[in-house]
């Protein structure tokens, strides 16, 4: 799953549990359904990834799709200018979105035998998440 900065789902790929995430990175980036502006020198498209994508395949997949990859190196923590550790990065955005989706019983326990049916159910749940976010935004205005 790929999400935007606030946790809104942008694209999802369904695969077996024994497939590593870095092998699905290109498919996941291609699954984004929202039109994005073409990256330029002044406005690049950034892609923040976790340490599991710290390999040549992860870097190449992000760059070939026009993104500037931000991948924390394995064993590296963010240090401030004095050399002390700063607050940990917010890597919980995708996990929070998966938590929202796990409230749907059909997604939490996969009853659908065909992957296309399961993908459709996930996409329906993602669209409901976007609808709820828009509805809350309208109420806050």
Put a short name on every predicted segment:
Residues 4:
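Short, acidic, Ser/Thr-enriched surface-loop or helix-capping motifs
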Residues 13-38:
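Active-site beta-loop-alpha junctions of metal-dependent nucleic acid enzymes
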Residues 18, 37-115:
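Helix-centered, glycine/charged polyanion-binding patches within enzymatic domains
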Residues 25, 50, 124:
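Residue-level signal for inorganic ion chemistry
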Residues 34-37, 106, 129, 133:
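Generic structural signal for secondary-structure transition and capping sites
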Residues 118-141:
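C-terminal domain-tail junction helix/linker
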